[in-house]
Regions:
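C-terminal, beta-strand-rich globular interaction domains
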Residues: 60, 64-143
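Long, hydrophobic alpha/beta structural blocks
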Residues: 1-93
């Protein structure tokens, strides 16, 4: 699989595995845990390869419920192959953490994804972004 295909395949695996439970917190946990794995392997001369058990452990560690994992092995083998692996550098976004809606794109420092959460406010799903000190809109500092 090409790098782009690996990324698309991983995204589909996550989406298909989680189904209706594919929420912001779980996807953020997967992102954070994947980046943590890459940071731990940074000193190694070999690229970090993720086998089926590695990806399964990543998802479980990220809070994917056990009942959602029952078809994971079959889905991984169909999408990636029984003996094939995914390169972590192809499936992770270490430089950006991007949240999109049809009208809005929010880019967050990947190490600070904890500043963003989803909440229901007045019956609507909303992104809530913690602002610690400095806020700019189109280059203009606002209070």
């Amino acid at each position: 699989l090409t790098a782009k295909d690996q990324k698309t395949t991983f995204q589909s695996l996550v989406s298909d595995t989680l189904g209706e439970d594919c929420d912001y917190d779980t996807v953020r946990n997967i992102h954070d845990n994947l980046n943590e794995l890459m940071a731990e392997a940074k000193e190694s001369p070999d690229p970090l390869e993720l086998s089926r058990p590695d990806v399964k452990h990543l998802l479980e560690r990220s809070g994917v419920p056990e009942e959602k994992m029952e078809h994971f092995d079959k889905n991984f083998e169909e999408a990636v192959g029984e003996k094939n692996t995914l390169l972590a550098s192809n499936i992770a976004s270490v430089k950006t953490f991007q949240i999109e809606t049809p009208d809005i794109i929010v880019k967050v420092n990947p190490e600070r994804s904890d500043l963003v959460e989803t909440r229901e406010i007045d019956g609507r799903r909303c992104l809530v972004i913690a602002i610690d000190d400095h806020l700019e809109v189109n280059g203009i500092e606002v209070r």
